[in-house]
Structure formats: structure tokens, C-alpha cells
Amino acid sequence: MNKLSLFLGCIVPNRYPGIEKATKLCLQRLEIDACDLPGASCCPAPGVFKSFDKATWLALASRNIVLSERMERDVLTVCNGCYGSLADANMELKKDPEMKACTNSCLKEIGMEFRGTSEIRHIIEFLYKEFGPEKLKEYITTPLDLKVALHYGCHLIKPSKDRNLGDTESPVFFDELVEATGAKSVDYTDKMMCCGAGGGVRSGYADESLEMLEHKLDCICKAGVDCIVNACPFCHLQFDRGQIAVNEKFGTDYSIPVLHYSQLLGLALGFSPDQLGIEQNAVQNIEFLAKIYEISAGLS
């Protein structure tokens, strides 16, 4: 198992520091050698930069990768978008010598060189491949009696030919990691549908973004779950703060708690909701908070 540098991206440190805290607590408890990545910038967002200025995207992404190469560590992301951007850039530069040379000519101006010695990992992909559900269960001290609506997101599993995660049309690897915590991953209609945040939709097409989200929330609500679990802070933002916008636009009253997988796993590893920053979310469901505090205290 290689040493890791933790790439937080933009949304985690600026909007959801609880995800950062939860991730670091989980990594420590699982005895994973991971450290911060000083100097890291935006990944940058694959659905924006890559689509209209590939050279700039590669230069910015490779700069982040080089920071980790210098530390002789692989990059660990907690965000689907960051994973997609960095993993795709890493792969393209390794496969295309001409593109690599062009990118290195840009990096040379700041005293850097991309060598291609680091791999890009997503925390879900990493835990599944390096631990697996059964080994992960050995660390669980507080099994979670929760029904979960799992959201994979887009960049974690696409493009499927590059992700090496098995069937990406009906995947199960993330479900298995959720159920390793004792929680139940509940199936629901349009589970694999985009949340409506990525690709510039949330920022450029707000109405369409909220319509997509409302459909997802309706399907999730009908499944009768305790919470939504995701693996991406941008999806997390969409489900959490987006619920408030959906309620205002459509006159609905959704109040579905939203957790990043690091927070769910943290609960199962024995950390309290307060330690994991769960109460920092926009959606505050008193019944859910009471339930997870009871679980955390061993009263459930």
C-alpha cells in the first residue's frame, strides 16, 4: 500500500470542513499513511476547463500531481470531480509523449516537471481495492442501524474503460462499503442518475439542475431511507443546500440528511457526529441527529 497525499479540492475546505475532519479521522483509525498536500490548487473542474482549454487543464492538473510526486506519494481524493480531473490528466500525460512534453514546457516556467510516478486514488476506490468490505468490517466498533440511499455520482465510475471498477452500469462496490458499516443500502428509482450539479449545470442552468435534483429527492424519499450518502463534496452540496432551493422552488418539504461516506464510516468507527462535522450541514433533521447520537452512545 503506497503512501498518500490528501487532495481536498475546493468545496471541502471552503464549505464542508467536516468532511475533511471525518476523512482524516478515518484514515488515522485505519492506519493509512496519508498527509496534507501543501500548495495544492483547484483540480481544476473537468467539466469546465477541460471542455474549452485542454492545455490549461493539463497544466493545472499536472501541477497538483507533481506536488505529490515530489513527496513520493500517490494522490488520494475525496471528490468525484477531483478524481476525474486528476486521474484523466495523469493517464493522458502518461500515454501521450507529445502532450506530456507540451505540458512540461509550461511546468518548466515554475520549476516543475511531470514524471508520471504517482497514481490517483479516490477514497472509495482505494478502500474497496486495498481493504475490501470484509477487512473493513474488522475495524467497525459501532454497527449502524441505518437505511441509506447511496449516490455514486458520475466521475467515480465514468469513463468506465478507465476506472477499472467492474460493472459501472449497475455497480455494487460502493454499496458493499456502505453495508460494511452495518447500514443497509436501499435501492431506489434512477439511483445512477446525475444529481444535477456537475458539468456546469448547477451554475449555468439552475432551473434544470433543481428539476433533476427534485426528481432524485422524490425517488429517494419514496424509498424510505434515513439519509443520503455520497462520495463527492459537489454532489453533497447539491443534495444538502440544493434541498433548500428545491423546497423554495417547488413548495416541497424535503429534509433528508446528507452524509459523505467518510462521515458514515466515521460513525461506524466510533466517532461522534460532532467530531465528524455532521451538524454543519444545511439540512438539519432533528430525528436523524438524535438517532445517530444514540447509536454513537451505544443506546440504540
From Swiss-Prot:
One of its GO terms (biological process) is methanogenesis. Binds 1 [4Fe-4S] cluster. Pfam families: CCG (PF02754). The ferredoxin:CoB-CoM heterodisulfide reductase is composed of three subunits; HdrA, HdrB and HdrC. Pathway: Cofactor metabolism; coenzyme M-coenzyme B heterodisulfide reduction; coenzyme B and coenzyme M from coenzyme M-coenzyme B heterodisulfide: step 1/1. The gene is hdrB. It is found in: Cytoplasm. Its main location: cytoplasm. Keywords: 4Fe-4S, Cytoplasm, Iron, Iron-sulfur, Metal-binding, Methanogenesis, Oxidoreductase. The keyword Cytoplasm applies. Belongs to the HdrB family. This is Ferredoxin:CoB-CoM heterodisulfide reductase subunit B. One of its GO terms (molecular function) is metal ion binding. Part of a complex that catalyzes the reversible reduction of CoM-S-S-CoB to the thiol-coenzymes H-S-CoM (coenzyme M) and H-S-CoB (coenzyme B). Its EC number is 1.8.7.3. It comes from the Archaea. The keyword DNA damage does not apply. Coiled coil: none annotated. The lineage of its organism: Archaea, Methanobacteriati, Methanobacteriota, Stenosarchaea group, Methanomicrobia. It catalyses: coenzyme B + coenzyme M + 2 oxidized [2Fe-2S]-[ferredoxin] = coenzyme M-coenzyme B heterodisulfide + 2 reduced [2Fe-2S]-[ferredoxin] + 2 H(+). Its cofactor is [4Fe-4S] cluster. GO terms for cellular component: cytoplasm. It is an enzyme of class 1 (oxidoreductase).
